[in-house]
């Protein structure tokens, strides 16, 4: 989780009053922070990935003002509508299609603030941007450029500019090959014939997203006006990132000015988009979740402390206005969590359960531990990944047809979380892609649930436990993975039978499936699986440069 560093001095200056340091340390957990360390000068506080609005000191201060009742409700931001536009090139639709921009004027930047802005940007890159793949952010000195602005597709060999922290004019390809940031993020653009550029009205290149800004628009302590650009592959994530940046960087009296994005392939949009979300909270539901009696008036009071606007509709319902920077609020239950925060977790009465229980080991967890011990004994390292994935990651990149029995998300928030996985193989390949800069060989495994539709099941869905493992190395081949599977099966106390298997994710003729039979007749489970060498086209899709071998097994109870 992101760790935010700030000094007492800068926090108290923005807060408008000074607190005893020990009091601040005790308050921070009350606003969903985990204080990692502190001394007489600085605090290091950890915040959950669902609260990116806390990733700068301005967001922390905003919340503290509510908790201390120095301010209540949603802050009022000075937003000025302008005629400034950014026009999007049609060629970017299949490269990096979305952009959101705004201007922030009359900011005050000293050395500390400059450092904070850079750290804020990088935290957002990691949490919302998935290390710039989904979202990338550029923050520029507005006074060095002029509108209107353009989001263009540039020729990699014919277009050049001076990248940040450089003195030499480089082509876009040279930046990817020779610049530190270019080398690190080249994988995000290399497959395309043209690369995205942010250009001003005079033809000055401001940015090459998601790689690097121009030296021309570099921020300094003399900068007073900012141009913010956010580009990406998911319009919701792009919008969320810009809204959070605009809100946080304008907390200290700066003025936000809008920019309209003109698309050839999407509806035009004006940013920032501060149109709030409205959610109704029911007093009875809040009482049941929190475990105390709450009136509608008390709910309004607690929500205003947590920086929401709230209106009592009647004794049963409170209408809540959610600011756009609170991207963690999706449902009534999220509002109820904030009611508890505003009420104060330390104020909730402690109550012992009125029944006694006896703890026993969880048999499913014990089984997982056996699997973990076997795989660790084979020199594999365990990973954990999300169950949600997308059809592109799960099927297309593995050369598979989309299956009808997959479980899909009805209203996905992002394009890369649209279904529940049916296999663990793609999760392993994604992990290897993210870690391809690390030393080889890499040997990883995962134990996790997958799901698929079954109309005969009570819930119309079946969940199954699987284990998958993968190895990337220069010498990985079918013989290697066959030996690994044989060792795994033997260590589990089984014997196996092999058959030829054809799977489009694997090289034809270098893939097999197997069934198993326990050596101990009292073994309560069995398993089957498949293994082989990953197909070169799949390796290319995941930008992997060395052979990969993998196996996957599915467990079931003996009837």
From Swiss-Prot:
<dbReference type="GO" id="GO:0006432">
    <property type="term" value="P:phenylalanyl-tRNA aminoacylation"/>
</dbReference>
<keyword id="KW-0030">Aminoacyl-tRNA synthetase</keyword>
<keyword id="KW-0460">Magnesium</keyword>
<comment type="subunit">
    <text>Tetramer of two alpha and two beta subunits.</text>
</comment>
<dbReference type="Pfam" id="PF17759">
    <property type="entry name" value="tRNA_synthFbeta"/>
</dbReference>
<feature type="binding site">
    <location>
        <position position="338"/>
    </location>
    <ligand>
        <name>Mg(2+)</name>
    </ligand>
</feature>
<dbReference type="GO" id="GO:0005524">
    <property type="term" value="F:ATP binding"/>
</dbReference>
<dbReference type="InterPro" id="IPR009061">
    <property type="entry name" value="DNA-bd_dom_put_sf"/>
</dbReference>
<feature type="domain" description="B5">
    <location>
        <begin position="274"/>
        <end position="350"/>
    </location>
</feature>
<keyword id="KW-0963">Cytoplasm</keyword>
<keyword id="KW-0648">Protein biosynthesis</keyword>
<keyword id="KW-0067">ATP-binding</keyword>
<keyword id="KW-0479">Metal-binding</keyword>
<dbReference type="InterPro" id="IPR005147">
    <property type="entry name" value="tRNA_synthase_B5-dom"/>
</dbReference>
<dbReference type="GO" id="GO:0003723">
    <property type="term" value="F:RNA binding"/>
</dbReference>
<dbReference type="InterPro" id="IPR005146">
    <property type="entry name" value="B3/B4_tRNA-bd"/>
</dbReference>
<dbReference type="InterPro" id="IPR041616">
    <property type="entry name" value="PheRS_beta_core"/>
</dbReference>
<feature type="binding site">
    <location>
        <position position="337"/>
    </location>
    <ligand>
        <name>Mg(2+)</name>
    </ligand>
</feature>
<keyword id="KW-0547">Nucleotide-binding</keyword>
<keyword id="KW-0436">Ligase</keyword>
<dbReference type="InterPro" id="IPR045060">
    <property type="entry name" value="Phe-tRNA-ligase_IIc_bsu"/>
</dbReference>
<dbReference type="InterPro" id="IPR020825">
    <property type="entry name" value="Phe-tRNA_synthase-like_B3/B4"/>
</dbReference>
<dbReference type="GO" id="GO:0004826">
    <property type="term" value="F:phenylalanine-tRNA ligase activity"/>
</dbReference>
<dbReference type="Pfam" id="PF03484">
    <property type="entry name" value="B5"/>
</dbReference>
<dbReference type="InterPro" id="IPR022918">
    <property type="entry name" value="Phe_tRNA_ligase_beta2_arc"/>
</dbReference>
<protein>
    <recommendedName>
        <fullName>Phenylalanine--tRNA ligase beta subunit</fullName>
        <ecNumber>6.1.1.20</ecNumber>
    </recommendedName>
</protein>
<dbReference type="Pfam" id="PF03483">
    <property type="entry name" value="B3_4"/>
</dbReference>
<dbReference type="InterPro" id="IPR004531">
    <property type="entry name" value="Phe-tRNA-synth_IIc_bsu_arc_euk"/>
</dbReference>
<dbReference type="InterPro" id="IPR045864">
    <property type="entry name" value="aa-tRNA-synth_II/BPL/LPL"/>
</dbReference>
<feature type="binding site">
    <location>
        <position position="328"/>
    </location>
    <ligand>
        <name>Mg(2+)</name>
    </ligand>
</feature>
<dbReference type="GO" id="GO:0000287">
    <property type="term" value="F:magnesium ion binding"/>
</dbReference>
<comment type="similarity">
    <text>Belongs to the phenylalanyl-tRNA synthetase beta subunit family. Type 2 subfamily.</text>
</comment>
<feature type="binding site">
    <location>
        <position position="334"/>
    </location>
    <ligand>
        <name>Mg(2+)</name>
    </ligand>
</feature>
<dbReference type="GO" id="GO:0009328">
    <property type="term" value="C:phenylalanine-tRNA ligase complex"/>
</dbReference>
């Amino acid at each position: 989780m992101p760790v935010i560093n700030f000094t007492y001095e800068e926090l108290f200056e923005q807060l408008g009053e000074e607190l005893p340091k020990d009091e601040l340390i005790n308050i921070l957990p009350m606003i969903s922070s985990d204080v990692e360390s502190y001394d007489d000068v600085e605090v290091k506080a950890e915040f959950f990935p669902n609260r990116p609005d806390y990733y700068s000191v301005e967001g922390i201060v905003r919340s503290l003002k509510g908790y201390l009742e120095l301010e209540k409700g949603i802050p009022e931001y000075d937003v000025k509508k302008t005629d400034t536009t950014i026009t999007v090139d049609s060629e970017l639709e299949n490269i990096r299609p979305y952009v959101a921009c705004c201007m922030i004027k009359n900011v005050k930047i000293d050395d500390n603030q400059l450092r904070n802005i850079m750290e804020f940007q990088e935290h957002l890159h990691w949490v919302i941007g998935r290390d710039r793949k989904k979202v990338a952010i550029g923050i520029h000195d507005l006074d060095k450029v002029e509108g209107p602005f353009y989001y263009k597709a540039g020729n990699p060999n014919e277009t050049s500019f001076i990248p940040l922290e450089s003195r030499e004019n480089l082509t876009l390809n040279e930046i990817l090959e020779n610049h530190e940031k270019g080398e690190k993020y080249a994988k995000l653009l290399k497959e395309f014939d043209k690369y995205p550029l942010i250009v001003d009205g005079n033809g000055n290149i401001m940015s090459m997203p998601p790689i690097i800004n121009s030296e021309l628009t570099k921020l300094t302590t003399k900068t007073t006006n900012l141009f913010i650009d956010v580009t990406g592959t998911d319009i919701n994530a792009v919008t969320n990132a810009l809204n959070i940046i605009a809100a946080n960087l304008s907390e200290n009296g700066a003025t936000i000015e809008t920019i309209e994005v003109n698309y050839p392939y999407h509806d035009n949009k004006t940013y920032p988009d501060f149109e709030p979300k409205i959610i109704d909270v029911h007093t009875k539901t809040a009482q049941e979740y929190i475990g105390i009696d709450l009136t509608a008036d008390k709910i309004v009071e607690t929500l205003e402390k947590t920086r929401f606007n709230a209106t009592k509709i009647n004794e049963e319902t409170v209408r809540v206005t959610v600011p756009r920077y609170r991207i963690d609020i999706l449902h009534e239950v999220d509002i109820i969590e904030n009611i508890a925060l505003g009420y104060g977790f330390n104020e909730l009465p402690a109550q012992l359960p009125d029944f006694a229980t006896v703890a026993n080991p969880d048999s499913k967890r014990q089984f997982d531990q056996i699997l973990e011990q076997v795989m660790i004994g084979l020199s594999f390292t365990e990973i954990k990944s999300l169950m949600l994935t997308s059809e592109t990651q799960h099927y297309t990149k593995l050369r598979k047809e989309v299956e009808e029995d997959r479980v899909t998300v009805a209203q996905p928030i992002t394009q890369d979380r649209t279904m529940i996985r049916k296999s663990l193989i793609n999760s392993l390949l994604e992990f290897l892609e993210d870690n391809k800069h690390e030393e080889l060989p890499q040997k990883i495994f995962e134990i996790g649930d997958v799901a698929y539709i079954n109309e005969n099941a009570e819930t119309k869905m079946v969940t199954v436990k699987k284990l998958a493992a993968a190895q990337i190395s220069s010498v990985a081949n079918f013989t290697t993975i066959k030996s690994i599977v044989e060792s795994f099966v033997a260590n589990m106390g089984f014997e196996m039978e092999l058959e030829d298997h054809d799977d489009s994710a694997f090289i034809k003729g270098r893939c097999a499936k197997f069934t198993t039979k326990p050596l101990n007749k009292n073994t309560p489970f069995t398993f089957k699986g498949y293994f082989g060498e990953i197909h070169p086209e799949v390796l290319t899709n995941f930008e992997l440069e060395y052979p990969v071998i993998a196996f996957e097994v599915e467990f079931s109870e003996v009837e």
